[in-house]
Curated annotation (Swiss-Prot):
Record EC number: 4.2.1.10
Active site: 26, 103
Organism: Aliivibrio fischeri (strain MJ11) (Vibrio fischeri)
Name of the coding gene: aroQ
Metabolic or biological pathway, per its Swiss-Prot or TrEMBL entry: Metabolic intermediate biosynthesis; chorismate biosynthesis; chorismate from D-erythrose 4-phosphate and phosphoenolpyruvate: step 3/7
Function: Catalyzes a trans-dehydration via an enolate intermediate.
Stored HAMAP family: AroQ (MF_00169)
Protein name: 3-dehydroquinate dehydratase
Gene Ontology MF term list: 3-dehydroquinate dehydratase activity
PANTHER family: CATABOLIC 3-DEHYDROQUINASE
GO BP field: amino acid biosynthetic process; aromatic amino acid family biosynthetic process; chorismate biosynthetic process; quinate catabolic process
């Protein structure tokens, strides 16, 4: 990588409640702690991250659109939009930026409606059920992929 790679980290609805909401599923860390750890990790890896959490689908879509020709990789936890948003899928396909889908909980061990993802078949990879560590693993995988290309 000749210039510093830029990675966009997107978090969907209700993830602003991490640490409060259903800690048995989502863990006790809040989103600020997760993003701070990712920022430290990114600095050590020599990459730059940008972060956005939104409960509004259109804001996530606009962030994806604005990433075009500016961002090298996306890490996304679409949260509930995983199971409902064709629009997020289309935005990701439209900008053609590789992405990894992350989920804190194991969505396949939960309610049946959580088993389907509109994004996973287009993702470079999917990490689920590993809690906040999933973001760390996703960042390592993204950097490794960027450095090998």
């Amino acid at each position: 990588m000749s210039t510093q790679s830029r990675i966009l980290v997107l978090n969907g609805p209700n993830l602003n409640l991490l640490g409060l909401r259903e800690p048995a599923h989502y863990g006790s860390q809040n989103l600020e702690q997760i993003v701070n750890a990712l920022t430290t990790q990114a600095d050590a890896l020599g990459v730059e991250i940008e972060h956005l959490q939104s409960n509004r689908e259109y804001e996530l879509i606009e962030a994806i659109h604005n990433a075009y020709q500016r961002i090298d990789f996306i890490i996304i936890n679409p949260a509930a939009f995983t199971h409902t948003s064709v629009a997020l899928r289309d935005a990701l396909l439209g900008v053609d930026i590789p992405f990894i889908e992350v989920h804190l909980s194991n969505v396949h061990a939960r309610e049946p409606f959580r088993h389907h993802s509109y994004l996973s078949d287009k993702a470079v990879g999917v990490i689920c059920g590993l809690g906040a560590d999933g973001y760390e693993f996703a960042l390592n995988a993204a950097v490794k992929r960027l450095r090998s290309n």
